[in-house]
Amino acid sequence: MARIAGIDLPKKKKIEYALPYIYGIGLTTSRKILKDTGIDPEKRVYELTEDEVSILNKEIQSNYIVEGELRKIVQLNIKELMDLGCYRGLRHRRGLPVRGQRTKTNARTRKGKRKTVGAKAK
């Protein structure tokens, strides 16, 4: 099993589709990495040689921010928005949708389970 950027890639998948298992690498980036390194995208992960794995590792480590480092940067960006007190930061703080979605109905994923409100007494 090839271990790239601290992630074990699935053996039987083509390398082109296995690289996106790494946080921060999508299909487009995966294709770009393979083109830059000259590795055949049709190759399966178990077919990679040690040299190819090390080339991929070097390429990703030197040119891309992935996994834990990227997660930390994203969290810091969200924290900065919250500290600034801007609209997006307030939405993050309140646990509501950030990108302008409606909240009268829907938004259950972001808001969590429904809170039952008692009926008013007359």
Swiss-Prot record:
Which GO-annotated molecular functions does the record name? rRNA binding; structural constituent of ribosome; tRNA binding
Which portions of the sequence form the region Disordered?
Answer: 98-122
GO BP annotation list: translation
Q: Which UniProt keywords apply?
A: Ribonucleoprotein, Ribosomal protein, RNA-binding, rRNA-binding, tRNA-binding
**GO CC, one annotated term:** small ribosomal subunit
- Which InterPro entries does this chain map to? Rbsml_uS13_C, Ribosomal_uS13, Ribosomal_uS13-like_H2TH, Ribosomal_uS13_bac-type, Ribosomal_uS13_CS
Q: Which family does it belong to?
A: Belongs to the universal ribosomal protein uS13 family.
Q: How does it assemble?
A: Part of the 30S ribosomal subunit. Forms a loose heterodimer with protein S19. Forms two bridges to the 50S subunit in the 70S ribosome.
Q: What does this protein do?
A: Located at the top of the head of the 30S subunit, it contacts several helices of the 16S rRNA. In the 70S ribosome it contacts the 23S rRNA (bridge B1a) and protein L5 of the 50S subunit (bridge B1b), connecting the 2 subunits; these bridges are implicated in subunit movement. Contacts the tRNAs in the A and P-sites.
The record's section on PANTHER family has: 30S RIBOSOMAL PROTEIN S13/40S RIBOSOMAL PROTEIN S18, SMALL RIBOSOMAL SUBUNIT PROTEIN US13M
- Protein name, please? Small ribosomal subunit protein uS13
